[in-house]
Amino acid sequence: MFLQIVTSVLATGLLYALISVLQQNRTLSASLPPGPPGHWLFGNAPPKAFPYRHFAELTETYGPVFTLRFGRRIVCVIGRYQAAVDILMKHSAETSDRPRSVAANEIMSKGHRVLMTPAGERLKKYRRALHAFLQPSSSATYKPMQYKNAKNYVLDCLHDGGHHLDHGRKYAASVVMSVAYGKTTPTSYSDPEVLQINKSLARLGAALKPGAYLVDTYPILKYCPGYASHLRRYREEELALITKQANAVRELLAKGEAPPSFTAYLIENQERLGISDDELAYLSGAIFGAGSDTTAAALGIMTMAAACYPEAQARVQAQLDEVVGRDRAPTFEDEDLLPEVTAFVLEAYRWRPVSAGGFSHRATKDVVWNGYVIPAGAEIIGNHWAISRDPEVYPNPEDFKPARWLNEHGRVRNDLKFTNFGFGRRVCVGQHVADQSLFINTALVLWAFIISQDAQCPIDTYAFTDTANVHPLPFSLHFEPRVKDMEAMLGAQAE
């Protein structure tokens, strides 16, 4: 008798849940942006590979904003520039939250990863700390260090062009290790701590892929014994690494020997900032995680574009010859006189965006757009790949055309933007340091070399890793020096 009662109660509960799902689906479907049909209960199947490309195809079919369902999760994907402005910028206050990320944030990161921290006081605390060290005035102080490392990048390409992607990783690691931890000696892409941090980033990227872990759709799985135990192991390994780096700075501070760094700033202001030791370690690690991964990828994309579009490369070099000449190397002081360099960088950002699929936002209130309603609680993805191919904003989007960023006077346009650093209140606080890195490396490498493809091994410009931040797969380049006595002129030897 008891078993019959229990069975009846469970059956009734299940029936009620199914009816609730059906009613919710019918109610929301009337107001949501359109989208591909899915299973009545489980919704749409997550894409197996390169979700941003799949979503771009759906944009062509369903329009600037479309809706997907994963279980009870509602996901609205934006694939056009104006829709991104209307929803994620004009409604930034209502769309700056992050959806719950159980696998990547709660299990792997103890809830401390800035990228996935929900809107609220904790996020404000984290961003205040980051902004103090990465705002434009602070970022400008890193230019001498970035310039030194950019010269080494050029010399590395001169001596060993076959490993140009590794040299980009070395540059990025050296810069962010200096900013984050005050490390002044050269950092190699093969240093153990760099390899371990990059391994952690790869694990994070895998956990962030849509549909990677069922726990993100059914959070109760988090409490099942043994579920995703490898994610907990990853967390302990990463926390041990970033804590070790932070403690090394503590020891130097205690001796009065610590150079300026973000970690030193956090330690000296820890009580005022109200951050725990674990939060401090993750904040410092965020500098490396965000800066190293994205900068290395962007440098690879820049050289790929130069090789594949020699006419665009030649335009930059003509201006470099006119403004700088070949008797000295370009510097940051030349930036205002080199709009062709800036335009080349901006087009590289657009042509192959590093954060191709973007990171999910979450609506905290209903957002009305073009007669549709994105309901509170829905996830919103600004798909950078599709937005970068908006033909109304970027005509002939598959072409690499830096000239689109210049006005009739040859100056950089103020009326054309791209959202490669994110949207609204979630824009990347490290964008100024990143822009500085891309400008000076592009200026120096195109001043120093004519970059071309290997005729025996043409570049596949769509061959990228299937990760949260995409990287070009290995490709061959030829670096032909344009400048005599390059090493002497750069005033530095390869390190």
From Swiss-Prot:
Class of the enzyme per the UniProt entry, highest EC level: oxidoreductase
Pathway: Secondary metabolite biosynthesis
GO molecular function ontology, one term from the record: monooxygenase activity
InterPro entries in UniProt: Cyt_P450, Cyt_P450_CS, Cyt_P450_E_grp-I, Cyt_P450_sf, Cytochrome_P450_fung
Keyword Nucleus: no
Coarse class of the protein's main subcellular location: membrane
Transmembrane segments annotated in the record for this chain: 2-22
Localization: Membrane
List of glycosylated residues: 25, 198
Key word Signal present: no
PROSITE patterns: CYTOCHROME_P450 (PS00086)
Residues that hold heme according to the record: 428
Keywords: Glycoprotein, Heme, Iron, Membrane, Metal-binding, Monooxygenase, Oxidoreductase, Transmembrane, Transmembrane helix
Name of this protein: Cytochrome P450 monooxygenase 88
